[in-house]
Amino acid sequence: MKVVVLVKQVPDTYEKRDIALDTGMLVRDGVENVVDEIDERVCAVAAELKKAGTATEVVAVTMGSADADKAIRKVLALAADSAVHIVDDELAGSDMIQTARVLAAAAQDADLILSGAESTDGGGAMVPAMMAEILGRPHIPYADSIEITDDTVTGVTNTDTEQLTLSATTPAVVSLTEKAGEPKLPNFKAIREAKKKEVSVVSPADLGLAAGPDAAYVRNVMVSAAERPPREAGQKVSGDTAATQ
């Protein structure tokens, strides 16, 4: 079974995040960019599938700027056998629709596509479902755990009121929560071997796609962006005043 793991490089959550008011996009320059933590957990699930012999090949796929190589190498050390890095200046600031189109084209030959339920920078949580729709495949959302038997993947999803057990025939798309896997620090051998693994750098054109705002048949448009208004001081009520009311 070929497993594709979707990976995203995001600004470190421990640092302050700012929005560029002229574009409405997250400022990524001048900050530490890292592999999204939830993607490390997805890699842990893929590593277990590989260890069990269920996954015969694990490929990491990311869409991002050229400086995402460091993040890719970490994922190669964690679980992946190879990686596909989609790079194009026209992809900067892509909305979820364009992101799903590009990632779906890159991952279409996978038997199982694993993704984090939502990224820490955008939090849209819609890209996996969009990919499934584009590829015509079933989608299991927000799975806390998965099991694979023959050509069936089963995921357990917990809602506020109940627990759901969902099954789908592969090829399929599954989005995983932070409960799905526990990432492990790669050892020195894994880090060294990751430097030798293949990373295919491709463009949307290589995938048979056009990129950019004019290429999208439907897209989100940022209308305006403004700084959050400063918080006003709360009204102070003395103990004596409260007692008399």
State where each predicted segment sits.
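N-terminal glycine-rich FAD/FM-binding segment characteristic of electron-transfer flavoproteins
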Residues: M1-Q245
